[in-house]
Amino acid sequence: MPATNKGSGVLTLFENWDVTLDNLPAEDLMPACETAIWHDEYGPLVISRIDTSGKGGYRLRMGDDIAVDVHPERRIVARFRPEVSRTTVDHFLADQILPRVLASEGQFILHSGAVRMGDGAILLMGPSGRGKSTLVTSFDRAGLSLMGDDAMTISWSNGQAGAKPVYPSLRLLPDSIEALLPDTVTTTSVAYYTAKRRVTVPVADTNGATPLPIQAIFLIAEPIENGKVGLRSLTIAEACMALVESSFALDPTDVIQARGRLADASELARNVPMFEIRYPRDYAQLPEVRAAILAQVAALETA
């Protein structure tokens, strides 16, 4: 039966949207009215255009198990097979649907983790699998406050770029949990399609809070097998393109919205220092990675 009561949890994040969860038989899960427009190169997510009511809309699905329809009248319908857990559905809504519907409303949402340093934020950006969650956890264990590990809303106030998490979270692979966190930490499953675990750690609930000024952004490059930590400043053009590539979109093919994201990325690239950091994926080297990032931020403050 459909459920629309938001109660508590992930549905409360969809403040002005009507969200329905519909557990349907398999044959009713995928109505044949979709045209695929985008495939995620890092996972099974597919975004399609749909037209079930003559008004258009989008369907985001994860294989044949979950399909979420986003309608233009601020209505979301999530359909899923009976064997799919509510935990998986909630993760898909928070991880993929929420950032994309916010982006469709004109917000600039980055696929990025962040930690708080003093009164500002350091953003750690990169594609899925680059180690954002591992690095923000390492910073958190070293004394900086974790803001979130996946999606950041970027906004402006008096010419200053600020960041706040779309939703507070920390998800890690088992080997990172074992290497970085104490044995007493509590974890729960995230979704059947990922090996990551949700980690119960203190993450400030910043929903509604004032965004923190962004001190710098660090793009995590592909890992190197051996060698020292490398850090280089990105040109404005390089930074702009990296920001565009790391931004969420409900319709990645929408030219008008793409122009808006490009304008947001260009403004951010011109006003916030951005660096590429490259290092071996070795937990023992994370202190050196943190030191390089903090030294660069300190140098910016004294420049």
Predicted regions span which residues?
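A broad, low-specificity signal for short, low-complexity segments enriched in glycine/proline
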Residues: I37-D40, R75-A78, E83-T87, Q107-F108, ...
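Long, basic/Gly/Ser/Thr-rich N-terminal segments
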Residues: M1-V84, I293-A303
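Post-Walker A alpha-helix
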Residues: L135-V136
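Glycine-rich, often acidic-flanked micro-motifs
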Residues: M1-L11, E15, G113, M117-P127, ...
